[in-house]
Amino acid sequence: MSELTRRIIFAVIAAPASIAIVYFGDWALAIVLSVLAALAAWELFRMARETGALPLEPAGIALAALLPLAVHAQRLGVYTLSLTAIIAMILLLFASTIWLRGPAGKPLSSVAITVFGVMYAGLFSYIYALRYHDYAVGAAAGTALVFLPVLLTWATDVGAYTFGRTFGKKKLIPSVSPGKTVEGAVGGLGLAIVICLLYVRFILMPYAQLGLTIQGAVLFAIVVSVAAQTGDLAESLLKREAGVKDSSRILPGHGGILDRFDSLLFVMPIALLLLGRLLLPIPL
C-alpha cells in the first residue's frame, strides 16, 4: 500500500470520527484528548532523549494525560485546577528527580523538559474548552466553534504548500525549515482569510447563531494563520535539534501526533482568547 493511499484511508476514517467525537463531547472528548496529550508528551520526551536530555517520562506522560480530564472535571464542578496545584506539581517533580537520580541525573534540565512537555501536550485541553465555550449553546454550536480554527489551520497548510510550490522563491527561515517560503506563508494566510469569511457565513451563523464582523473575521484568520505557521516551525526546530524526520510513526502516512497537531496546539489557546472578544450573537 502506497504512502498516499494510507494517508487517504486515514483521513477518510479520521475526519468523520473527529466530528462525531467533538459533537458528542463530554467524557468521550475528554478521554480522546487525554490519549492524544499522553502520546504527544511521549513523542516530545522521545525527541528530548535524542538530544541527551533525561525527562521524567512516566510522570510527565501521566500529568499531560490528566490535564484534559481536569478541564472536564472543572466544567462539571468536580475539581478546579489552581495555580497552587501546578506549582506544587513542579516542586514535586523537582524533589523526586533529586531523590531518585541525584545531581548526576541532571535534575534541573530533567524537570524543565518534563514541565515543558506536560504544558505543551496539555494544550489539547483547549479543544475541550472551546467545545464548551460560554457563547456556544448546544452541541452544534460548540462543534462549529472547534472546527473554525481547525479548518483555518488546514487552509493555512494547504495554501502555504500550494503557493510555495507554485510561486515560492524566497526562503522563510531556511535554517529551521528549508522547504518553507515567504510566498507560501502569504498564500496560506490569504486562503485562511477566504475560508474564514465563508465558514462564518455558511457554518457559524446558521448552525451556531454566532458571527464575526468582516474585520473581526479577517483579524481572526490572520492571527490564527500566523500562529499555525509558528507552531509548525517550532516543531520543525525541535525535530531538527533531535535529528529526526517525524515525531513518531503512530499515524499511518502522517508521522506522529505532534506532526499532525503541532500547528493546532499553538492555535487553540489563541483562538479561545480571540473568539471570546470577537464573537457576536446572531438573533434567531
Residue ranges with predicted function:
Residues 156, 186-187, 258-268:
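Membrane-embedded alpha-helical segments of transport systems
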Residues 17, 69, 253, 268-270:
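Hydrophobic residues in alpha-helical membrane-spanning segments
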Residues 273-284:
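Juxtamembrane boundary at the C-terminal end of a transmembrane helix
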Residues 1-222:
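Membrane-embedded alpha-helical bundles of polytopic integral membrane proteins
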Residues 223-228:
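Transmembrane alpha-helix interface/packing and boundary motifs in multi-pass membrane proteins
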Residues 240-264:
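Interfacial loop-to-transmembrane junctions
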Residues 235:
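Acidic, glycine-rich loop-and-beta core segments that form the ion-binding/anion-interacting portion
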